[in-house]
Amino acid sequence: KTKLGAFLDLETTGLNYLSAEIIEIALVPFRYSSDGRIFEVLEPFNQLQQPKKGLIPEEITKITGITNEMVNGQQIDVARLKEIVSQSSIIVAHNANFDRRFAEAEFDFFATKPWACSMSQIPWRDEGLEGGKLEYLAMKSGFYYDAHRASTDCYAGIELLTKNLQTSNKLTFNVLLEEARKETRRIWAERAPFDLKDILKERG
């Protein structure tokens, strides 16, 4: 029996989820088994959104290639997005700490789902790799892609999950699922003093 997972990637106007906005979302569903084998990649959900608070900063356009003209009048189909998320057993993101905050702040239905991070929850360094950046991992796994657009990042992430790790030879997605199944706790530091933000960030 297979389950449905979904790989998420966002492009945003900045790094702070309290002030920046989502300008592109990609969610690529895939079918997988409980031991981490991915059998099928399904039709992607990929949409742009015009920010409500002004224009896309120039430096963000340089990184993502997304212009104000491209997002003009665009809006995310929340009902369709919710449908995909509700059917998914797990949401995977590369650097989920970033994507999850934005996703849950804008769409509350993400908060009820289990999440997994393909960057922090796989021991890449133990597997002989120097870091967890997606482009680097893709290159080391033998494939290249056009980074910094949401849908291509998702496809690259899914491709990475289908590979065996270099040192242990374990299936990457199986390792991630085992890690994601461990019990975790989330702590919110709401209305913490501004001068404590760096300390809190360091502590995760």
Region annotations inferred by a language model:
Residues T152-L160:
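Acidic, divalent-metal-coordinating active-site segment for phosphoryl/phosphodiester hydrolysis
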Residues M119, R125-E130, K140, L161-T167:
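Extended, compositionally biased eukaryotic interaction scaffolds
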Residues T112-I122:
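Short, acidic/small-residue loops that bind anionic groups at enzyme active sites
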Residues K1-P114, E127-H148, N174:
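Conserved non-catalytic scaffold segment of RNase H-like nuclease domains
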Residues K1, K163-R203:
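Acidic two-metal-ion nuclease catalytic site recognized across multiple nuclease folds
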Residues P44-F45, N68-E69, S120-I122, E183-T184:
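Short, contiguous strand/loop micro-motifs
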